[in-house]
């Protein structure tokens, strides 16, 4: 299938708020506290790729403490989708990349079993140096995960598990995201292949050129956990220099709002560059099928 003019979020009512959906080649940040429904929204977006582009999106989990984000349980319950996980230590020979059965996977947990805190301030200089060596190895695996899916038709990705810190610049998760976004997701396919294959690039050059994809036709959704629980607090949150919110084309805020004597969930499209979008605060609920937007 051809890449659409807009990527559906998997929620028709939200697509309508966004003037038709998300813009290809851009970053969407979905921000809200733990448990508000970000992972479900991310899965709905990823699943929508099956109908729209012919391939579901992929999930890149950056949670560094405890288990992942329960993507497998959610995907099975919401869509009867059994996620195929790529393991962090799974070997990958150059010839494997072109084998769809070998490379096409749905989920990758980069910091699985690491148990690390997300702030660089928590690490001594020698610990940070040691951790960067380990990160480099994990990033090599990450290149294989993304490239190995993109050459087989995937056009959307969801990055989840980003934990809150006082300053985004102190978070090693944001260092990793910055690398992935600029050196994998927004880089010409043949140059990503060079980073992956290195000395084996020439031997694979013909296959690389026959599997080119346009990185401007990829859509990325970053699910960003906030300290703030209330939607009003998120609306007032300052954006610091280097914050991924400043670089995003689209920002969707999800939080709690007071409705009389009870709290309910609501979302707001705070930014949607280059497109008309609604200014409304829209209540929603989470069902077995995911997010459902409600009448105000």
Where are these regions (language model features)?
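Pre-Walker A adenine-sensing motif
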Residues: 8-22
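NTP-binding/hydrolysis catalytic cores, primarily Walker-type P-loop NTPases
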Residues: 24, 131-135, 278-296
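Short acidic, S/G/P-rich loop/turn micro-motifs used as interaction or catalytic elements
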Residues: 36, 163-169, 229-232
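Conserved inter-motif catalytic segment of the P-loop NTP-binding fold
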Residues: 61-166
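Conserved ATPase-coupling elements of RecA-like P-loop NTPase cores
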Residues: 165-176, 188
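Charged helix-capping and loop-helix junction motifs
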Residues: 172-179, 236-242
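Phosphate-binding/switch region of NTP-binding enzymes
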Residues: 189, 193-290
């Amino acid at each position: 299938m051809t890449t659409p003019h807009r990527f559906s979020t998997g929620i028709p009512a939200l697509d309508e708020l966004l003037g038709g959906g998300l813009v290809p080649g851009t970053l969407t940040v979905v921000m809200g506290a733990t448990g508000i429904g970000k992972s479900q929204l991310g899965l709905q977006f990823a699943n929508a790729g099956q109908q729209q582009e012919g391939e579901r999106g992929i999930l890149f989990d950056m949670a560094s403490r405890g288990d992942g984000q329960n993507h497998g349980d959610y995907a099975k319950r919401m869509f009867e989708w059994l996620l195929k996980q790529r393991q962090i230590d799974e070997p990958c020979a150059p010839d494997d990349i072109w084998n769809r059965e070998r490379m096409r996977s749905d989920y990758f947990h980069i910091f699985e079993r690491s148990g690390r805190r997300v702030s660089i301030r928590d690490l001594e200089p020698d610990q940070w140096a040691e951790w960067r060596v380990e990160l480099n190895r994990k990033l090599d695996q990450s290149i294989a995960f993304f490239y190995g899916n993109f050459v087989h038709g995937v056009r959307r990705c969801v990055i989840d598990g980003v934990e809150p810190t006082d300053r985004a610049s102190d978070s090693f998760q944001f260092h990793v995201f910055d690398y992935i976004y600029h050196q994998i997701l927004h880089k010409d396919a043949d140059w990503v292949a060079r980073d992956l294959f290195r000395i084996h690039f020439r031997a694979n050059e013909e296959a690389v050129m026959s599997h080119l994809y346009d990185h401007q036709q990829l859509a990325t959704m970053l699910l960003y956990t906030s300290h703030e629980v209330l939607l009003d607090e998120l609306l007032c949150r300052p954006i610091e220099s280097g914050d991924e919110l400043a670089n995003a084309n689209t920002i969707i805020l999800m939080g709690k709002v007071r409705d009389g004597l009870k709290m309910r969930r609501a979302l707001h499209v705070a930014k949607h560059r280059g497109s008309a979008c609604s200014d409304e605060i829209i209540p929603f609920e989470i069902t077995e099928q995911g997010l459902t937007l409600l009448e105000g």
